[in-house]
Amino acid sequence: MCIRDRVKEKSDWDTNASTVHKGVAAYFCHSTYVAVVMEVILKKNQPKLKKVWCAVDCGIVINKEGATNMIEGRIIDGIGHAMYSELKFENGSSVHKNFDTYDFIRHRQSPSEIEVFFVENEITPTGLGEPALPPAVGALANALYKATGSRLYHQPFSKHHEISLV
């Protein structure tokens, strides 16, 4: 079973609920496969992240707790980059001189739960630092499309599409 099928199974993808919207995306880099499903609900017509499922095939996992923490962090970073982060430049240098002018995701905007599971195999360990961020962006965009009916092509979504997480 491929990781995309596994994450869809774990997230109960085929269950249809009119108030719950799910998006899926998969990615491969550094010899690691990652698939993400995000679950979004609308609260006063604004999206709220409920739960994220993530399947990872990165070979032998030496430190499962540390690996899970890395994946969770990259998912939250991916959500933050997709929704809020934008580097602005003027005359060849960054407008942002400190973090007070650069938007980050807030704790209240993070998913209520992230479930990470690893494919168990005997393959040599591979990369784990980057692979979960890109599919988090894609899964979020797909879930927001299902929730709002609008495709999101430009980041940050909050600026270009006037969507903000509650």
Where are these regions (language model features)?
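Cofactor-binding beta-sheet edge motifs in enzyme active sites
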Residues: 4-166
